[in-house]
């Protein structure tokens, strides 16, 4: 499995004429080698070249099983970038990760005189974007768990509760259902707090008539889930009901057009234009979706500027929203898996307007 992924990355490198890359993102290194390390501030990198050479750079602080690649170990007192430089071909362009820290990159460039550096993340990112069978199984299972957590949360919420109480309940459910962690800190927003798409739970108390935005995800077997539902406490104004219906239909219209060959920007615009047709376009303040896998936000998005086309095996979110400042917010989010002729919506929990509490 790991060698197949490495081969796919090298094939992409060769197509662009790039002979070497340095992978430094821990999730990407795990994806290519099976080595799971949280390096903190220490160097952790995988060197790949177009001839199939694989060299893993590891601090002796970490204990890992031997893998199918060369290993170069170093201690905290060693000059780790000199060890990197000993492997890199300074006469050839080197691709590096988009987020690699300057504390390693700059010393490496100083040691490799004349080395040309380019962004090399896309070779791994594009490979990670197409999920294999095992990854898909994990993400389907995790989305099923997420549906259960959302349903339990919906049934738990009552008028007079605080956002923090709901957050604590959500965290406990993931533990009970076997998740090792959450994909991200749960978002639980009552009333006007819902106008902030990334509001963090506080001591706000739920009152009748308020919107309730719940955005949650769990992490199990390294893979993430993510979904959002919006409910209303006991009652809602006609305007709020209308807004919820607009957002829900925008979500469904976007999902309906997803199939291989469709541009990601056109998926975004399908939802965005529908919302705009009701006069709420300025209140849809973010892109339609993001890719997801080992991390909640992997490289790739569903935005009005992304002209890349959809491919089978991609998994991403569809999450339109309308946010009225100082009043309320509504967001409806599913994960979708692209198939050979369409897509499968991984979240099955009802997303129609509902009153709770």
Regions found by a protein language model. Give the residues of each.
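Active-site neighborhoods and metal-handling regions in enzymes and metal-associated proteins
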Residues: 1-357
């Amino acid at each position: 499995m790991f060698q197949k992924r490495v081969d796919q990355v090298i094939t992409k490198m060769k197509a662009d004429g790039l002979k070497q890359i340095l992978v430094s993102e821990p999730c990407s290194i795990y994806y290519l080698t099976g080595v799971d390390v949280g390096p903190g501030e220490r160097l952790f990198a995988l060197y790949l070249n177009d001839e199939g050479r694989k060299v893993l750079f590891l601090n002796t602080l970490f204990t890992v099983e031997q893998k199918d690649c060369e290993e170069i170990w170093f201690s905290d007192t060693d000059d780790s970038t000199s060890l990197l430089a000993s492997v890199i071909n300074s006469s050839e362009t080197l691709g590096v990760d988009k987020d690699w820290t300057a504390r390693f990159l700059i010393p490496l460039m100083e040691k490799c005189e004349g080395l040309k550096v380019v962004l090399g993340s896309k070779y791994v990112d594009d490979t990670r974007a197409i999920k294999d069978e095992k990854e898909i199984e994990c993400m389907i299972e995790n989305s099923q768990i997420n549906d259960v957590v959302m349903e339990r949360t919906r049934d738990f919420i009552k008028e007079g509760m605080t956002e923090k109480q709901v957050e604590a309940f959500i965290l406990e459910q993931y533990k009970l259902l076997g998740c090792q962690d959450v994909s991200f800190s749960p978002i639980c927003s009552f009333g006007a707090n819902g106008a902030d798409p990334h509001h963090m739970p506080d001591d706000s108390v739920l009152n009748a008539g308020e919107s309730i935005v719940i955005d949650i995800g769990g992490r199990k077997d390294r893979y993430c889930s993510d979904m959002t539902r919006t409910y209303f406490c006991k009652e809602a104004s006609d305007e709020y009901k209308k807004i919820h219906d607009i957002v829900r239909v925008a979500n469904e219209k976007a999902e309906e057009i997803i199939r291989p060959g469709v541009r990601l920007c056109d998926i975004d615009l399908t939802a965005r234009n529908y919302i705009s047709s009701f006069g709420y376009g300025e209140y849809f303040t973010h892109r339609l979706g993001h890719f997801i896998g080992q991390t909640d936000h992997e490289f790739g998005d569903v935005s009005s500027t992304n002209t890349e086309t959809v491919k089978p095996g991609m998994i991403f979110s569809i999450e339109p929203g309308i946010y009225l400042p100082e009043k309320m917010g509504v967001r409806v989010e599913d994960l979708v898996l692209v198939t050979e002729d369409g897509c499968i919506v991984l979240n099955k929990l009802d997303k129609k307007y509902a009153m709770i509490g």
